[in-house]
UniProtKB/Swiss-Prot annotation:
This is ADP-ribose pyrophosphatase, mitochondrial. A motif (Nudix box) lies at residues 215-237. Its EC number is 3.6.1.13. It is an enzyme of class 3 (hydrolase). It catalyses: ADP-D-ribose + H2O = D-ribose 5-phosphate + AMP + 2 H(+). Hydrolyzes ADP-ribose (ADPR) to AMP and ribose 5'-phosphate. GO terms for biological process: ADP catabolic process; nucleobase-containing small molecule metabolic process. The modification Phosphoserine is found at residue 121. Ubiquitously expressed but isoform 1 is the most predominant isoform. It comes from the Eukaryota. It comes from Homo sapiens (Human).
Amino acid sequence: MAGRLLGKALAAVSLSLALASVTIRSSRCRGIQAFRNSFSSSWFHLNTNVMSGSNGSKENSHNKARTSPYPGSKVERSQVPNEKVGWLVEWQDYKPVEYTAVSVLAGPRWADPQISESNFSPKFNEKDGHVERKSKNGLYEIENGRPRNPAGRTGLVGRGLLGRWGPNHAADPIITRWKRDSSGNKIMHPVSGKHILQFVAIKRKDCGEWAIPGGMVDPGEKISATLKREFGEEALNSLQKTSAEKREIEEKLHKLFSQDHLVIYKGYVDDPRNTDNAWMETEAVNYHDETGEIMDNLMLEAGDDAGKVKWVDINDKLKLYASHSQFIKLVAEKRDAHWSEDSEADCHAL
């Protein structure tokens, strides 16, 4: 009798401990998920604050902007150690290399003149005619007539390949759909238990890296127009289509780009083209084709600056141009799609 009572007591205790364990794990996972959601929505905001700070700890947010050689050249930047990236860190011996590409100095319509030219008086930190010189991250400083990169030193002054002094505004359309099997059912990742999201990626001609199909905002152009135009040019080769084909593409893109969308990020981008005086900023927007019907009727074809184009499964193994991997990660989190096998498996198993 005593043995049976002891057995029941032990079973009850074991059940209580098991339930407590599940409760704790569930609570922990909910906490982790809540943290992830909060983190994903503020990651770039926090990073931007760090970049515009002065403590010199920039290794995670200002790395590609210090790489050498500078893209499309043999120019080597002056080396900038992590602890001396921030402008408020005194560095009297800082001697950055001066470089502006010949293609920029040739004076194309998308490029500013040199600061030294007498007839050039840019209005920094404001709208300058049709040119947007305001930064999405707030005011930036001007030193000796040149704007100063809010993220810190890059080891190179001038504009490099960038046309504008100060912020150079771009737009990155992230087009997504669910990965489906031959029967049209959404495919779930076997470890995370979350559905697999795909996005349209292009292989850049200039550097050979895979990227989001985006591009520069033309003077006076709305961001929404840039997003649609760039996707059409790079992922659908719209520039080489007949008038009738262009109209058909436009109709289908209008349907995709006029629906609800997610603004993933606005602001400074850690880009290998950045210099001390010119830098990239972007607005990354996610347009999701929930059923896949819109994109099924559009044939992907690389065009303009793209060498290749394809649908790519989204996961943490992606290696993309500039900060594009972080944009894609945020999309996966916002859409509650698969990203990593490691971080989500425990919580999904509950």
